[in-house]
């Protein structure tokens, strides 16, 4: 090895040593060293990772002890004895012990994770366990049926919960859920005491809520109706009218959504009161038999005062929305009683699991329908209680981006928070939200 080669090797060694020194000196200036620093004066945003002190200040550290909770021991309570209710957003491990980080604020949560990362096992299950231990009522969507199988039994056996499994995959094995239940309930109270106007008003209110929810099935959006807005609005009033009539005059076993379809279909037929008179629809004849001050007559006023052709269009619009319920299996779930209604859900420890059939998306509209209706009925209960529920309720919407658009979802997130309603939306990517709600709705 000659002298030049020795010098070259020496220079390379010196350069390598200098490189290591520079890397070590600049390590404090790497991304790890500027976690909590803002760029400039916030021109590129002020978001940053929270410091350990901020995490400790924002979230409550709670020993996660499901084995003890199920025995009624060490239930989630703060130092002053208040029950800890909220969302598990993370955890810390300390030996064999796990400490959960719980957000107890009036907030909603968005959980994003690709398929297979453990959204259900490592996020949803701990949250449901905390909900049971702290006494929060909750509704959870379930695409595989695992959540209902695993935690339905736990909630009922160990935490004394009312449990309802709405199985859209096997409706014949599902618990019952008559979406007209509250209308029927308050109409019966009113019929037993005609002076109870509060019960009558509640029956009318829930009838209108149910009608609005049905009209908004799928892609129903008042902003997209355009020139057809009259027909959808009139169909909504017609549905509310027929629901009220069934609740008031129908037999006990016939007051369900399929009877609403059958009645509207029968009222489409025409009769000729006089050989020289123009044929009239039985719908008009039925309305003529009602007192002029009957609310069902008022609700159907838009359709009743339209031309025959417009009335046919209104009734056809209502029937088109009700077509989705014409399923021999679904009827076993929709045409009888209700295991858990909104009032029981808010006032007692209750859990509702909605099992989605991954192989049959035709039933996915029921998920949006059930969530919309339950949410709107809970708002009524909250308003009657001074604008806030007595006990927090949780909506665990697993695969939120998969099932059809929930009409008014944006307002659900904004209005529900102040009423002690927390929504936990679990998605795989923002693209799912953008597809269903558009870019503006996603944001």
PLM feature segments, named:
Residues 1-117, 121-129, 134, 172, ...:
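Basic- and hydrophobic-enriched, low-structure N-terminal and domain-boundary segments
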């Amino acid at each position: 090895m000659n002298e030049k080669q020795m010098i070259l090797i020496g220079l390379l060694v010196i350069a390598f040593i200098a490189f290591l020194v520079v890397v070590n000196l600049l390590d404090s200036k790497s991304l790890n060293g500027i976690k909590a620093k803002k760029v400039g004066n916030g021109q590129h945003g002020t978001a940053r990772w929270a410091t350990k002190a901020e995490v400790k200040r924002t979230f409550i550290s709670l020993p996660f002890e499901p084995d003890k909770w199920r025995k009624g021991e060490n239930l989630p309570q703060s130092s002053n004895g208040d029950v800890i209710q909220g969302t598990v957003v993370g955890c810390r491990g300390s030996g064999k012990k796990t400490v959960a980080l719980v957000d107890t604020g009036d907030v909603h949560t968005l959980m994003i994770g690709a398929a297979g990362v453990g959204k259900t096992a490592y996020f949803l299950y701990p949250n449901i366990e905390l909900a049971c231990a702290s006494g929060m009522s909750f509704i959870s969507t379930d695409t595989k049926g695992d959540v209902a199988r695993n935690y339905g039994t736990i909630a009922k056996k160990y935490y004394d919960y009312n449990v309802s499994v709405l199985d859209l995959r096997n409706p014949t094995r599902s618990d019952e859920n008559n979406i007209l239940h509250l209308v029927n309930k308050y109409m019966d109270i009113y019929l037993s005491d005609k002076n109870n106007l509060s019960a009558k008003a509640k029956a009318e209110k829930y009838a209108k809520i149910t009608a609005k929810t049905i009209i908004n099935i799928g892609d129903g959006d008042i902003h997209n109706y355009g020139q057809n807005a009259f027909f959808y609005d009139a169909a909504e009033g017609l549905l509310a009218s027929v629901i009220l009539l069934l609740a008031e005059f129908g037999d006990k076993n016939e007051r369900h959504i399929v009877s609403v379809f059958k009645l509207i279909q029968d009222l489409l037929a025409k009769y000729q009161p006089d050989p020289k008179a123009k044929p009239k629809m039985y719908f008009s004849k039925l309305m003529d038999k009602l007192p002029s001050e009957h609310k069902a007559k008022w609700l159907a006023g838009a359709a009743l005062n339209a031309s025959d052709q417009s009335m046919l269009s209104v009734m056809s619009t209502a029937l088109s929305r009700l077509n989705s319920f014409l399923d021999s299996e679904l009827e076993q779930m929709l045409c009888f009683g209700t295991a858990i209604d909104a009032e029981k859900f808010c006032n007692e420890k209750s859990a509702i699991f909605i099992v989605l059939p991954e192989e049959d998306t035709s039933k996915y509209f029921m998920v949006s329908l059930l969530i919309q209706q339950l949410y709107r009925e809970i708002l009524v209960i909250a308003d009657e209680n001074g604008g806030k529920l007595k006990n927090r309720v949780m909506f665990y919407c697993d695969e939120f981006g998969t099932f059809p658009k929930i009409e008014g979802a944006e307002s659900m997130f904004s209005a529900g928070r102040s009423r002690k309603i927390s929504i936990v939306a679990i998605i795989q990517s923002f693209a799912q939200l953008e597809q269903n709600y558009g870019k503006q709705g996603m944001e």
